[in-house]
Amino acid sequence: LSCAQRSPPAFVQRCLAAIDAVGIETHDLVVEVTETELVEDGSVAEQSLLALAEAGIQVAVDDFGAGYSSFDYLTRMPVTYLKIDRRLTRALPTNARARRVLGALVTMCLDMGVAIVAEGIETEAERDAYLEIGINAGQGFLFSRAITVERLVEDLRAEAGAGFSAG
């Protein structure tokens, strides 16, 4: 979500109306906001995100560690997921200091009930380094290149049908 998209309360009302119109559960949704936007426009973000969280929508902070990394917003905002920026992913396999920082972050997030997702995983070494420090959710080219919605639906249907016989 960009700052322009989420000026309260109109943004929250539009979101909830759209969710109601398509008939999905709010707890099945995750809104994603960048760390930079939280720091640069914190009051607008805070109002909108708190209202969305009250409605049951989960909040993910994207690109964590890329810029400001303010712990202040983690104490005020209803954060469900922290998505670790790919720059930290690149450093992790060979940088002991990066491993210690991220290891401490894992401990803190576990204590707060915040899940961590590693972004930009391209190599097995990066994946393995994250697994070693306790992060077991990630995304990146190691797992899949970007695909269209149509391709995703195709893949999910194929996966759902795998292993079943029609007779």
Regions found by a protein language model. Give the residues of each.
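Short helix- or helix-capping micro-motifs
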Residues: 85
